[in-house]
Regions:
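Short, solvent-exposed loop/turn segments at conserved positions within beta-propeller repeat blades
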Residues: 263-267, 320-325
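Amphipathic alpha-helical repeat scaffolds of TPR domains
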Residues: 35-52, 78-90, 121-158, 187-194
């Protein structure tokens, strides 16, 4: 079967069934057309995303940062305000807003030096750790993400993984060197120092430094060879949060396709169809899965015994009381394949 004919039919291949507490709700499947049950799930997921609570869900970092900023502005004591400022900066860092987080840590440092020197000394180590981490993340975002190579962020850093945009790692080293002089045995700071140094192309074998991790640390008695990263060259480089993966033949053409989910409330799955020529084509929209967001894990099986691979999607892991999110059963209805 050619890819174009599947392209026309794949929009009808998956329908969504609600699953709760381990029990299958058959009525939506039995009495609703695929489009109706899928739309019902889309609306349910949207409502849950809008109702998510940043107080209880510690992974809603952007919302939590804004929440702490509002609380800091309303704080009635200096200590409380400064505590909330630190929490806001940490949340911006976890949200991926590295430079905004840096601004927050720098603002806290300036205030603490001026009005609370004892508090500054008490939090000095933590502050320097986070400030250097902000710079490390800037370097990763500008190089590993925006200017990705097949060697990006693979340890130990090889020549192709050295950062072309150097300000992130250089900024980190400007903080880490004086911090390590004060905390010379701290392993976390040493680790960040080595990452920043390697991404700048510094060689531990030729540069004498007491904080280097020996190159022998990365050696192994077992040579398993090299697995080159070819995702970008075959159309399979998906940039998303952690999620599930199923590799199987979804359209019955004898070729292995790729289906991945992403954990975030608003993150769509990605369906990549094997074209038989060594590449994959994104067919997510045609598959009808685009708005069925979220999902940390997936399980594949032919639950209805029609010869097609179906997919069970699990949501809500690690979210505690916020994790009561309906699961999905995506029925592959590729009849005639």
């Amino acid at each position: 079967m050619n890819g174009f004919s599947y392209h026309l039919r794949v929009c009808r291949t998956f329908q969504c069934i609600w699953v709760c507490a381990g029990c299958l709700w058959l009525l939506p499947f039995s009495y609703q057309p695929a489009e109706a049950s899928t739309e019902a799930m889309v609306q349910r997921l949207e409502k849950l995303a809008k109702r998510s609570n940043p107080v209880r869900n510690i992974f809603l970092s952007s919302l939590r940062a804004r929440m702490f900023a509002e609380q800091a502005a309303q704080a009635t004591t200096q200590d409380k305000r400064m505590d909330l400022m630190l929490q806001e900066a940490v949340e911006w860092l976890q949200a991926g807003a590295s430079e905004k987080a840096m601004e927050g840590f720098n603002a806290w440092e300036a205030m603490a030096r001026q009005v609370a020197p004892d508090l500054y000394e008490k939090n000095h180590y933590l502050l320097k750790f986070y400030q250097s981490l902000c710079w490390i993340r800037v370097g990763e975002q500008e190089n590993c993400l925006a200017n990705h190579t097949t060697a990006s962020c693979l340890m130990p850093i090889q020549a192709a993984g050295v950062h072309r945009l150097r300000r992130g790692s250089e900024g980190a080293l400007s903080i880490l060197k004086p911090a390590l002089e004060r905390y010379p045995e701290d392993l976390s700071l040493k680790w960040l120092f080595n990452i920043a140094s390697m991404t700048l192309g510094h060689d531990p074998e030729t540069v004498s430094n007491p904080w280097w991790i020996p190159a022998s640390t990365w050696s192994s008695d077992a040579d398993i060879g090299v697995f080159p990263d070819i995702a970008g060259s075959v159309g399979a480089d998906v940039n998303a949060l952690s999620g599930g993966t199923v590799l199987d033949d979804f359209n019955g053409d004898g070729l292995i396709d790729i289906l991945v989910t992403a954990w975030g409330f608003h993150d769509s799955p990605t369906y990549l169809q094997n074209d038989g020529e060594g590449r994959f084509t994104d067919r997510t929209r045609e598959s009808g899965l685009l708005e069925l967001t979220g999902g940390l894990n997936m399980v594949s099986a032919d639950y209805d015994n029609d010869g097609d691979i179906d997919v069970f999607v699990l949501r809500g892991a690690w979210l505690g009381s916020e994790g009561r999110i309906p699961k999905s059963l995506w029925q592959n209805d590729a009849r005639g394949i």
